[in-house]
């Protein structure tokens, strides 16, 4: 089973996405009716839909959608990680219609000014609650927050972590070595996987040549068994269409064996998010 481990959905008639206001290509609704034909064309069988807004209303809507749409096998939702009652909030989400699809939680740490935000006591308490609920935690961080992410992952071995967008590296001649050094600390932790996602929008066309060294680092440090493909649709449309995003990823992983490729394009996501293969 081929799994897209990272995409988004939104309906601007239901809720605004303020961050899209200056991005014309993203300034309209994107639904499963739009994505479904793209999945078919790229032979993708299942998906993991990921939250976009720090609002309590979005995640129940995604769970309800997962209950109706067989393509959506998992939801990475949002709840206030620092709220004292986070355990109760997670229980409520799991009991919601479609709650069985809740596989992870994400907070946009990249929007927090503090590079040590993950090491705050209230954040750590929330992460522990996520792990205790049997859920993964998606790390959405800036490169300067990677040291805090490394410390957090090391000190919380019972929590499953997923690093979104490879840690948002700067795709530049002087960016590779610095990013690889920061990432190495996570590579040694077996409780974290990483997404090959969100990179086409950071690299100039034709994308693959400038991204290949980064993909090589990911494979070297994490291996196929801890690497998962995600399209980051529709955000990827800023650079290329869905099929183009898949093609870039397949080019970057083309040297893998059939079994290794099956991990990147399904097996890793299925294990980390608990989806059926």
Walk through the language-model features, giving the residues of each.
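Catalytic pocket-lining loop regions of alpha/beta-barrel enzymes
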Residues: 117-228
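Alpha-helical scaffolding within the catalytic cores
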Residues: 30-35, 57-58, 85-91, 146-147, ...
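Conserved, mostly hydrophobic/aromatic
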Residues: 6, 47, 62, 75, ...
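An N-terminally biased module of ancient metal coordination in phosphate/nucleic-acid-related enzymes
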Residues: 1-66, 247
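Mid-to-C-terminal alpha-helical segments outside catalytic/metal-binding sites
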Residues: 1-3, 26-46, 217, 221-228, ...
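Short, electropositive alpha-helical surface patch
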Residues: 57-73, 157-163, 214-220, 245-252
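Active-site gating/metal-coordination segments in enzymes
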Residues: 57-144, 151, 193-200
């Amino acid at each position: 089973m081929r799994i897209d481990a990272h995409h988004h959905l939104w309906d601007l008639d239901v809720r605004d996405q303020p961050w899209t206001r200056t991005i014309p290509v993203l300034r309209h609704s994107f639904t499963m009716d739009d994505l479904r034909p793209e999945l078919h064309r790229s032979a993708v069988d299942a998906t993991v839909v990921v939250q976009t807004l720090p609002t309590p209303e979005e995640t129940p809507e995604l769970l309800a959608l997962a209950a109706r749409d067989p393509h959506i096998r998992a939801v990475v939702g949002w709840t206030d990680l620092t709220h004292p009652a986070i355990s109760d909030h997670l229980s409520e989400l799991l009991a919601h219609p479609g709650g069985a699809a809740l596989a992870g939680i994400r907070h946009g740490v990249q929007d927090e000014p503090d590079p040590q935000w993950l090491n705050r006591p209230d954040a750590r308490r929330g992460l522990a609650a996520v792990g205790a609920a049997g859920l993964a935690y998606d790390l959405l961080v800036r490169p300067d927050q990677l040291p805090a992410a490394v410390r957090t992952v090391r000190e919380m071995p019972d929590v499953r972590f997923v690093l979104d967008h490879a840690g948002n590296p700067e795709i530049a001649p002087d960016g590779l070595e610095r990013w690889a050094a920061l990432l190495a600390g996570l590579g040694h932790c077996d409780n974290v996987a990483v997404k090959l996602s969100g990179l086409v929008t950071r690299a100039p066309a034709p994308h693959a040549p400038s991204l290949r060294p980064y993909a090589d680092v990911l494979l070297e440090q994490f291996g196929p068994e801890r690497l998962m493909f995600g399209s980051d649709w529709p955000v990827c449309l800023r650079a290329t269409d869905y099929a183009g995003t898949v093609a870039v990823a397949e080019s970057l992983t083309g040297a893998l064996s059939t079994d290794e490729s099956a991990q990147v394009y399904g097996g890793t996501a299925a294990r980390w998010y608990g989806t059926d293969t």
